[in-house]
């Protein structure tokens, strides 16, 4: 009785969060320049591909990656379409711009989904980092979608990177 109710509630909440993420992806597809290849990463990529590992997720953000040379153009398009970065101090802004693998988190007004716009999958300061150009050579098309995803082996590599570089061990084991 009670446990079954909790499980049904969790499944419904997961379905809701997945739908919210899909709505955000649709808005992003309209906002980003069509000529810029955009890669969906991590959980949003699993959902986009309808992978088994996507089931039961509670997505709260979407991670996208563009080539470094397309970063300013993609950011400008997002800002022009209403996304805005969190207010951060000059030190943190410089950190994101010079040393991180992503821009400061962005959000669209009225949306609960945070957007992380990456230009590679590991921080610039990471000891081990993949050749981002190679990641872009094996991108996979998701049928009927504007977005691309990493090659399945690169998705595993990315999950492994997060497993060993992040502190959220349990969630990252599931992704791997």
Question: What are the roles of these predicted feature ranges?
Answer:
Residues 1-60, 66-176:
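Conserved NTP-donor binding/palm subdomain of two-metal-ion nucleotidyltransferases/polymerases, i.e.
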